[in-house]
Amino acid sequence: MTARVSIVIPTFNRARLVTRAIDHALAQSVPVEVIVCDHGSTDDTPEVAARYGERIRYLRREQDRGPIVCWRDGVEHTTGDFIHINYDDDWVDVCFVERALQLFADDVGFVYTRARIHVPGDAEATVMLRHPGGIRPMSQLVQFLLREKLPISPGCALFRRRDALKNLLPEIPGAKGVYGKNSGVGEDLLLFLLTSLDYPRYAHVPEPLAHFLAHPSSITTSAGSSGRMNELVDAYAVARAYYRQQPGSTAQATGLAGWLAKTQWKRAGRRAG
């Protein structure tokens, strides 16, 4: 039986950008369900969505209750076995879903790809997540996620629907500040970390099939420009602390063991290109 895949596009006041996300979702080389979840947009987003007719499912809520509520609303309305959360300012290559599905197995928790960061005005995009490709031990990726200040984005990953519903938390206990409740900062990291508890392996496609747009209103760029990067990093530290409280969680390797793990990871990534 062919796996069913749903692409969820949460959006808020980005009518100008969301069309690219929708167009690339609809152009996938395998059939997908596309759900656009709009919480409280006051721009032309409803009109933009209407142009696609029955090719997409448009969920409209009049109240904006924050990113994480919008993400979950979209995921809860999917019918696929697998889901991809595609932020409204990002997009994926037409082969993204097909290539990710090829690496899924019963013991693989999720699949993610490399990504390109596009800065308006820059001729060449930066490739990120140069990690070793293929199916690999989950413990390797967990060490990376515990070590790095900023996480892998769900925008370059494919998850099982049941895992997304279980592990995309409405909020993180202890989270506070501007990146606390309902911001999605930390919840995105925990989607990976909590899912890792149930699977021995993950998979990585060593091709940049996801595309992220760096612009003033994107969360990472705005954190840097507003002097709140430390608060952003702290929010992810709270998420890691929550993960470490869970049964079966992995402690971060430190000292010589941590240095060796990091070195081996980087070498494998360089060999992969």
Model-found features: residue ranges?
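Short, acidic, metal-binding catalytic loop of nucleotide-sugar glycosyltransferases
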Residues: 23-32
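Acidic helix N-cap motif at the loop->helix transition within catalytic regions
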Residues: 16-19, 43-51, 91, 95
